[in-house]
Amino acid sequence: MRRKLVTGVAAASMAVLSQAPAHAQEPGVKADIDGDGRADPVSLRQVSDDQMLLRAGLSEEFTDAVVQGNARGLPLIPVDVDGDGTDEVMVPESVGANTVIYTTWRYTPEAGLHPVRTADGKPLGLAEGGGARALSTYGCTPAPDARLLVAVNAFATPDDSAFEGERVTYSVRDGIATLVTSAPVQGAGRDDPQLQADPATCAPLD
């Protein structure tokens, strides 16, 4: 069946593609972003120093979105942060020396590809990494008929004796991440359970 490009972003995508360097990478993954039970190819292409093109190949069309940032060759990560059986993808938008900042992108027929946002309308950013004096990670925990998304961010105290920060839990529904709990972390060692979360627990459901 002949595929078509979703027209809502076609012009912007073509403009971005026209600026793409010849060496731009396009790492791809498979994720069932439309919930039809079939894995869709999803790719990320670096088209300039600060812009990327996110593309998904659905059964009858391609859909694109322009994403600000630079993945520096890191791949997309398929996830299902709400446990509804329809996948999302984590997009590495900012890559530092020790930490990667991800945003979570989803698809709907009405809005195409778009980021999961917090209740105030901002894209939800999740950090992974940290280095010797910081710790950031995320994961998912089971909830009745769903999953909850957990984000952990902490920094070493001035004397390096412990970590302080917060552990935040979100409920993601219809692309909106609603705050459930925000628990302060104080006097915790790096191995403290309050600082633990496993990104693998957000993997797509079998």
Each model region followed by its residue ranges:
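Long, charged/polar, surface-exposed segments that mediate recognition or autoinhibition
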Residues: 88-119
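Terminal domain-start segments
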Residues: 2-5, 11, 15-73, 193-206
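Structural recognition of the beta-propeller blade-terminating site
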Residues: 58, 105-106, 171
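Structural motif
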Residues: 50-53, 97-104, 157-169
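Acidic, small-residue rich beta-repeat scaffolds with periodic aromatic anchors
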Residues: 2-5, 23-33, 124-206
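Acidic/hydrophobic-patterned starts of short beta strands in beta-sheet-rich repeat architectures
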Residues: 35-45, 81-93, 143-152
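Mid-chain, structured segments of secreted extracytoplasmic proteins
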Residues: 64-95, 101
